C-alpha cells in the first residue's frame, strides 16, 4: 500500500490516531469500504499506550480483570492495558495481584485452544478479550466459546475499532467506531453494493495487514 493513500484521523489524546484508506477491500468474512491500518498501534509503544489509556477510560474501577486474551497480534496493547489496570488499582483475583496477558493458539480449523500449562490463567478467571477490531464478530465468538469451554468468565470485549457496543451479551468498548469514518460500511460478500456496481476489489485485508490485488 502506498503511504500517500493513507489518511490519518487524529484525536485530542496524544498519539491516539487512526490510519485508514477508502476503497473496496475483502476480509475473510466481509467486504468493507475502509482499510484500517493498525500496524503502528500494535507495534509502536507510544501508540499502544494511547490505545490502552483510551480503553481504560471505559471501565469502572470495580471491573474485575484477571487475564487479557490478545487476538490479532494485540500483545503490545494488551501489555500496556495490563499495566494501566494494575497501576490504577483495578481489581483482580489473582494471588500475585497482577494480570495475565495471553495469546491464543489456533488449530488448523481456526479453533482456539489452550494447553494444560495455560489453562490456569483461564479457568475460573475473568478474561478480557482484546482484538484489533470487532466487526463481523467471528473472532470474538471463537474467543468467547474457548474461554467458556475452559471454565473462564468473559469480562468484556475491547478493540481499537468496533462497529457494535454489545456482542453475544457482552459489552464491547473501542477507541474508534464508525462515527469516526464517514460512510463506513461492511457487507457479506454476496450482498456487497460495491461488487454489484462492478467496483473492483483493491486488496485483501486481515489482522496482519493489506495485500494489493492490482
Regions found by a protein language model. Name each.
Residues 1-64, 207-214:
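Active-site-facing substrate-recognition patch
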Residues 2-9, 144-214:
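PRPP-dependent phosphoribosyltransferase catalytic core
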Residues 57, 83, 87, 145, ...:
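Short, well-ordered alpha-helices that flank and scaffold nucleotide-derived cofactor binding pockets
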Residues 59-61, 115-121, 189:
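Short amphipathic alpha-helix with an adjacent loop that forms part of the alpha/beta core around
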Residues 63-74:
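Short glycine-rich phosphate-binding loop at a beta-alpha junction
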Residues 66, 125, 155:
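Conserved acidic residues
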Residues 70, 129-130:
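Hydrophobic Val/Ile/Leu positions in short beta-strands of Rossmann-like dinucleotide-binding domains
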Residues 78-128, 135-139:
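Short, glycine/charge-rich flexible loops or terminal/linker lids adjacent to PRPP-binding catalytic cores
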Amino acid at each position: 500500500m502506498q503511504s500517500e493513500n493513507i489518511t490519518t484521523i487524529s484525536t485530542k489524546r496524544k498519539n491516539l490516531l487512526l490510519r485508514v484508506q477508502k476503497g473496496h477491500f475483502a476480509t475473510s468474512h466481509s467486504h468493507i469500504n475502509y482499510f484500517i491500518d493498525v500496524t503502528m498501534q500494535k507495534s509502536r509503544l507510544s501508540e499502544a499506550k494511547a490505545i490502552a489509556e483510551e480503553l481504560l477510560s471505559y471501565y469502572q474501577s470495580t471491573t474485575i480483570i484477571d487475564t487479557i486474551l490478545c487476538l490479532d497480534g494485540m500483545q503490545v496493547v494488551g501489555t500496556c492495558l495490563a499495566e494501566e489496570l494494575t497501576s490504577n488499582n483495578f481489581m483482580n483475583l489473582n494471588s500475585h495481584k497482577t494480570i495475565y496477558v495471553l495469546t491464543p493458539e489456533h488449530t488448523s480449523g481456526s479453533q482456539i485452544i489452550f494447553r494444560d500449562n495455560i489453562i490456569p490463567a483461564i479457568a475460573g478467571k475473568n478474561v478480557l478479550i482484546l482484538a484489533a477490531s470487532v466487526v463481523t464478530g467471528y473472532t470474538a465468538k471463537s474467543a468467547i466459546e474457548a474461554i467458556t469451554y475452559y471454565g473462564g468468565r468473559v469480562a468484556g470485549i475491547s478493540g481499537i475499532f468496533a462497529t457494535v457496543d454489545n456482542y453475544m451479551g457482552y459489552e464491547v468498548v473501542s477507541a474508534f467506531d464508525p462515527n469516526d469514518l464517514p460512510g463506513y460500511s461492511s457487507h457479506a460478500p454476496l450482498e456487497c453494493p460495491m461488487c454489484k456496481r462492478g467496483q473492483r476489489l483493491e486488496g485483501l485485508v486481515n489482522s496482519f495487514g493489506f495485500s494489493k490485488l492490482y
